Amino acid sequence: MRAALCRLRFQTASNRNILMNKHINDLLFHPFTPLKGSIKKLKKRTHAAVLKNGEVVCGRIRHWSSLSNCDFVFDREGNILIADYHIRNRKSAAERNLFRYDGKNRLLESWRIMRSCQFERNLYFYSEAGLLWEMQVYEGIIAENSTDYAGWLHFLPDGLLADKEGKAADIERLNLKHRHTVYYEYDGIGRLIRETEASESVEGVKTYSYDGESGRIKEYCFYENGIRIEQWLYIYTPQGWLQECVYRHKDYALPSTEYYEYDDEGNETAFLCNGELCRSTRYENGRPVEEIIYDSHDGGKPKNRTLWPAANERHCYTWHEKSWLLESIDYTNAGGNTLKSQFFQSDGTPNGTSECTYTAQEMLESVCSINASGEVTSRMQWHYGYDARGNLVRYYCSENGRLDSYDIKTLEIEYFDAEESV
């Protein structure tokens, strides 16, 4: 197979994270829907595509921070055959996700390889009509300590799992064990209506029932030895909003009920559990302006309140179980993000403050302790500096005026190395 490198980059700067995650999810993690991986579709989501002889046979989508890459192998019609999604930490792979397709945009095999040498393998099987009817899940861990193992496993174009030298990988080293199997059932026109998960490590079976027309879940059950242990029933409004959840357990005499209320635009205005109000939200022009969380175990007293006076401003209040104000938080992000917190004693006097200011290049956090007389007893301040790619490059700590600084290269912390990948 020819290998022409195609680098695909997102054009929108403000939503690069969201677009990347959504794009990867659309392409890789939904086995029920045929893959939307044609070249035309990919080009619409990208800034540029490099073609060879008018065809793309390999491709790469690169995360803006260069910490995540997704490499693709296509056939001549633009269908994805192999996908390799890897997240980098420093200069090695922190997690690897490998995907193999059948050339008809159906997922056949997937691997999740973690830096801790833990492995997850899924196998997918389809009916003659092309519907997914079984998924087998395996888990394992490599026998010896080999932290770079996740970095060089990959699929060859013919679908074989290979090592860094291109030879067939020794799967037996992974000690894979079959954990559970998921079976899928459909109605007469191919709509998913039931999902059954049978586990080999746990004596139990999980079943999920769906509405074939809307795809919404209707019921979840857990069985042990043929006896139903748990059941969740879901009821929706005519508009499709979740209205009620009923939970039953074989050891409980009465069911537990959750109920949701909405305004005309579908915004959730109230959440009740067993008839008691747990959360209420007030909206103005489709935007939340107030949310109150109540303590259902203490007569329905408010324990948290959040106000949004403006789109870039938020105020949070937390009450103690004895109804005195415990903490207040003020958040603004106009011209830089700022988070201010105040802590109070039972008589209403403050006993501490915390302020955090952060931008794309730095974060500054200050904490003060206050005694009963209102005097500041201690001050601590932390300063973190970042480069343009988000790497931590400076770190200072000040306690009561005494400054400590650290060389980031010798400081024993985890940070991302955003070096350009090749």
Language-model features: where?
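Positively charged N-terminal leader segments that act as targeting/secretion signals
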Residues: 1-14
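Buried hydrophobic residues that stabilize the cores of well-folded domains
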Residues: 20-422
